[in-house]
């Protein structure tokens, strides 16, 4: 996501202009293959300016030529350009209260390898870092990459975290982690640059970029699992708060006379609807004689599997949905989002939970804040954490500050491939020749890493009539072209 100041006529920084044009070009290619002439038309730049940038991107390995397109019978066939999604790798880590997952992603946030193991967050930081180091090495080996090809590491954790420093801040569900600097510790362990955020924040990014609500600018993502938290996306940007504590919906009091939760707040949402609370409730009702066919002992897995078929399980999920809806109505009235997406393990209860959430939230929300707000289940499932970590890393890399680092990684990956190809060419053939590769497949692309604001500004040139530029001033300096009203 490009979040740079736009150059003006007063401060003409040619390097900044070129960097911005480069990022806009990469954004276009991130969404599909294009010819140079298409890019020039889309960005309102001269062909010479585009060719200069493309030549540079090809030289570092970020862009590649992938074939030609018919010219309609007139002129030469246009060469298509493609973003090389394997030019750099991303290491995405989803650290939950009871699991750890590490994925190696390409630049489209598609998984190249994935490892998930049970892990109790209560085991503490050092045991967790050791495990993550082992999983990271195994995941990179499985993906066939070296650490030098990894541009960034992104990790989501189940508690409040200061995104700028990577330090955990008063996490109710991470005992022994308060004040722990995850960013610094993992950088020392992996010898790679690390970004850290709350898991619910990353869920919000994932659903807005890759889920059913892709492109949505105002979205609340509620992750309901061992704990309950929310990621708040406003105007396409995460709202983290002053210290990273925004979105702690699980600690909103929905009943001042209710039980005290882990945060110490009476009647908090987590004390009514967190995973272990629901299991304890179901066991107590089963012991009191409530009719049920749930297998003994009652577990979260059993409650999820029989959400629609067992009367006790259904009642538990309907009550949980009611309580979630009470808290969600607060977020609707505060932020007036376009969508609320429910993810996390509890969302696997499906329509039983969702129906109760909608009924409860709608009954408590002003009409202006609910009429056009959709409340849905997440569509990314267990992949939301790693996909969100990937989006966070793209937002850091595809910026003027991150671009030089991405260039360096891409050059390294290109050199590594060249050495491997040279070695393979000298080796004697083994077995029959491989079949010819199939024609390059096309896949539906997620929304680009540019915000809506940047798209509006970057597409202004192509919306103007080409013959009637009103009051435009042009500076042509070398291979740079800046169009200003």
Summary of predicted features, one role per range:
Residues 199, 225, 389:
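Active-site glycine-centered loops adjacent to acidic/histidine catalytic or metal-binding residues
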Residues 215-273:
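Glycine-rich phosphate-binding loop of actin/hexokinase-like ATP-binding domains
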Residues 80-82, 90-94, 150-154, 219-223, ...:
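Short glycine-aspartate micro-motif
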Residues 111-218, 352-363:
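Glycine-rich phosphate-binding loop and adjoining helix at the ATP-binding site
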Residues 456-485:
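Ribosome large-subunit tunnel/peptidyl-transferase-proximal elements
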Residues 106, 163, 233, 475:
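Short, acidic, Ser/Thr-enriched surface-loop or helix-capping motifs
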Residues 111, 168, 238-239, 480:
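Hydrophobic "anchor" residues
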Residues 1-69, 73-118, 122-148, 256-257, ...:
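ATP-binding/phosphotransfer module of carbohydrate and carboxylate kinases, centering on a glycine-rich
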